[in-house]
Each structure stands twice: as structure tokens, then as C-alpha cells.
Amino acid sequence: MYLDAAKKQEIFSKYGKSNTDTGSAEAQIALFSYRITHLTEHMKLNRKDYSTERALTMLVGKRRALLDYLKAKDITRYRDIIKELGLRK
């Protein structure tokens, strides 16, 4: 499986405030980014997989909403996370 508990724990410990921090915006954005990257690779091989395409679009929307929230709440945290993950503004 592409996203097991150990990989999630690694993402949360790297981007969250602690190992068990699963709710902070940064941790959720990092997890969504990992899933988006994986689904993008899947879509390159399976162009007609429309259910995955929809799931990918929904994940991008969720990540965008969290980024907008973080930008309004704390601009420095927003800038740090987009620089760390290599996202466009």
C-alpha cells in the first residue's frame, strides 16, 4: 500500500508540531500533497480512470482550502509550508 501507518507517522512527525499532531494545517497539507503526488503518477499511467481523477480534484480542493485558511491565519507558516513542499502560490 502506498500510504501505510509508518509513512503517515513520518509525515506527521516531519510537518506537524509533534509525532501525534494530525490536526494541524501543515500536517494535513503535507499528507494531502503526498497523496496528490501519488495519484498524479497513477493518472499518468491510467488516463481513463475517472474516479481517481475526481478524487484527485477533490484532494487538490481540500488542500487549497487549507492553504487559504493558513494564509489568512498566519502568513509566515503559509510561506514556510509552500516553500518546504515546493508548491506554487
Curated annotation (Swiss-Prot):
CDD domains: Ribosomal_S15p_S13e
Keywords assigned: Ribonucleoprotein, Ribosomal protein, RNA-binding, rRNA-binding
Any one GO BP annotation for this protein: translation
Keyword Isomerase included in the entry's annotation: no
SUPFAM superfamilies: S15/NS1 RNA-binding domain (SSF47060)
Keyword tRNA-binding: no
InterPro entries according to UniProt: Ribosomal_uS15, Ribosomal_uS15_bac-type, uS15_NS1_RNA-bd_sf
A Pfam family the protein falls into: Ribosomal_S15
GO cellular component, one term: cytosolic small ribosomal subunit
Gene3D superfamilies per UniProt: 6.10.250.3130, S15/NS1, RNA-binding
Origin: domain of life: Bacteria
PROSITE patterns: RIBOSOMAL_S15 (PS00362)
GO MF entries: rRNA binding; structural constituent of ribosome
Listed HAMAP family: Ribosomal_uS15_B
Subunit structure: Part of the 30S ribosomal subunit. Forms a bridge to the 50S subunit in the 70S ribosome, contacting the 23S rRNA.
NCBIfam families to which the protein is assigned, alphabetical: S15_bact (TIGR00952)
Role played: One of the primary rRNA binding proteins, it binds directly to 16S rRNA where it helps nucleate assembly of the platform of the 30S subunit by binding and bridging several RNA helices of the 16S rRNA. Forms an intersubunit bridge (bridge B4) with the 23S rRNA of the 50S subunit in the ribosome.
Family: Belongs to the universal ribosomal protein uS15 family.
Protein name: Small ribosomal subunit protein uS15
